[in-house]
């Protein structure tokens, strides 16, 4: 194979490697953003009122927030 052919194949390989690396970085950033959104949502959901805490305390559980106006009780709040 001529030197020109080898150089062209090398350049094509480098372009492929660079673009696949960029795609992986974008995918990772998207996943990170989704995780951050879930984390913020779970923190928002964990805010509890005193009424909810008292209700769940009677059941010896933790108040994880309210859903449709009803207290949500569990041993551990997972979000």
Swiss-Prot record:
Q: Name one GO molecular function term.
A: toxin activity
Supply the alphabetized keyword list: Amidation, Cleavage on pair of basic residues, Disulfide bond, Knottin, Neurotoxin, Secreted, Signal, Toxin
Q: List the disulfide bonds.
A: 52-64, 56-73, 63-77
Q: In which tissues is it expressed?
A: Expressed by the venom duct.
- A Pfam cross-reference name: Conotoxin
Signal sequence region: 1-20
Q: Which residues form the propeptide?
A: 21-44
Where Leucine amide occurs, the residues are 78
Q: Which GO terms describe its cellular component?
A: extracellular region
Entry keyword GTP-binding: no
Please state where this protein is localized.
Secreted
Q: What is its main location?
A: secreted
Q: Does the record bear Disulfide bond in its keywords?
A: yes
Question: To which protein family does this belong?
Answer: Belongs to the conotoxin O3 superfamily.
Domains: entry comment: The presence of a 'disulfide through disulfide knot' structurally defines this protein as a knottin. The cysteine framework is VI/VII (C-C-CC-C-C).
What is the protein's name according to its record? Answer: Conotoxin ArMSGL-0122
